[in-house]
Amino acid sequence: MKGKRVLVTAGPTQESIDPVRFITNHSTGKMGYAIAKMCMLRGAEVTLVSGPTSVAKPEFVHVVDVVTAKEMYEEVTKRAKDQDIIIKAAAVADYRPKSVSSEKMKKKDDDLAISMERTDDILKFLGEHKKEHQFLCGFSMETENMLENSRKKLEKKNLDMIVANNLKVEGAGFAGDTNVVTIITGQEEVLSLIHI
């Protein structure tokens, strides 16, 4: 990987509801940070665009901190054209509240409904604007039909590779130091890795 420019995304995003509350997911960023570190150790020039996480920043990696899906979209898309490899490991919010209250929302006796809107699709943009020399890898967290859903995502988003995992499999998912993944390429090659 010496001399290659690699962009990695990691962690969750946070979408504010009010100044106190936000919507997020269980991503810790560990996978993306580990990938960024390994690419750097293999000689790559690495940029890591990271959502909020407590994982220690890897040395000799340029880290760009973001909070929201919009910020991650902006930071990734403005850097994408200059990258040889893009690995999107971040668990970016698919939806955000349509409006954010400027004051803390007070508790009431009735139910609360929050109107949501789609966030910009980072992988869709990357796939549509992929340069001839670029390698694009995405991640797919599933709870059912993992292979089928991941293959569809690989094709729809114009990816070269997708790393799929099933949240219901023991040892897979968020927060752990191990994972159980299946790597799928455009040539229908499937490689299952246990506890990486």
Summary of predicted features, one role per range:
Residues 146-147, 170-176, 191-192:
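Short active-site-adjacent structural elements
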Residues 13-16, 144, 188-190:
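A short, flexible beta-alpha/helix-coil linker loop
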Residues 2-4, 133:
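Phosphate-coordination loops involved in phosphoryl transfer and adenosine-cofactor binding
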Residues 40, 45-170:
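Glycine-rich phosphate/dinucleotide-binding loop and adjoining beta-alpha-beta core of small-molecule
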